[in-house]
Structure formats: structure tokens, C-alpha cells
Amino acid sequence: MILNPVLLIVIVVVAMIGVIIPSVFAQQFEDFDYSIRGGEVLKFELDLDNTSLLISIDARARGELIITLPRAIIDAKIGSEDTAFDVFIRGMQLSSYEETITPYDRTITIPFKRSNDELSIVGTHM
């Protein structure tokens, strides 16, 4: 049985798309621009239901996480105006944090204490 060349090309293209697309989505998700002092980031997890980014860390000492959040992934706005993210450490809302805002992303600095292991950043949309 000889396959039609057009059908063969379509099969190859579909297979290639299936390999490429998951890695593109994983790259967007895994490649947050961040730095951490006093610990290590273990994983990032998006919670679409609660419009939040969950961050698991291993906090070995008092430190801080500086993370750049692309607006295409998570943002906090009321209408067209920026509003503050709600930031939680182990379920307790952080009263203040430093933030730098650009048209494309928002960079926030979250201080943490030793043994804090769970951070969440809640926006208004993802």
C-alpha cells in the first residue's frame, strides 16, 4: 500500500505540532524570570480557578523572591488601571511588597522567613 504524498506530509506535520506545542506551553510556564536569596524555588503552579500563581520554595534562611510576572500570564487590574496583587505566605496576606510596573510585566519582591514554603500571588485575571 502506497500512501498519498500529501497525506504523508499532513501526518508528519500533525506529529511535529504535537511535539512542539506542549514544549512551548511548558516553556511559558516554567520560564518565569526570578531570583531568590535565602532559599530555592521548587515549582510554580498556575491556579486558573483562583487566578493565582502558587510558588513552592525551600526557605533555608530569611530572604526574598524577586519575580517578573508577564501580564500575558497573570495580571491585576480594575478596568484599565493596575491594582495590587494579593500576596500570601502560608495563607497569611502580606501587608506590603515592592513592585516595579512596565507595560509588559510586573516585578514584585516578596520577603520571606526561614521555613516559609508556600507563596501565592493572586491577580484579577490570567
Which residues does each PLM region occupy?
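Transition segment at domain starts
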Residues: 24-58
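Surface-exposed beta-strand/loop patches in extracellular or lumenal glycoproteins
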Residues: 58-83
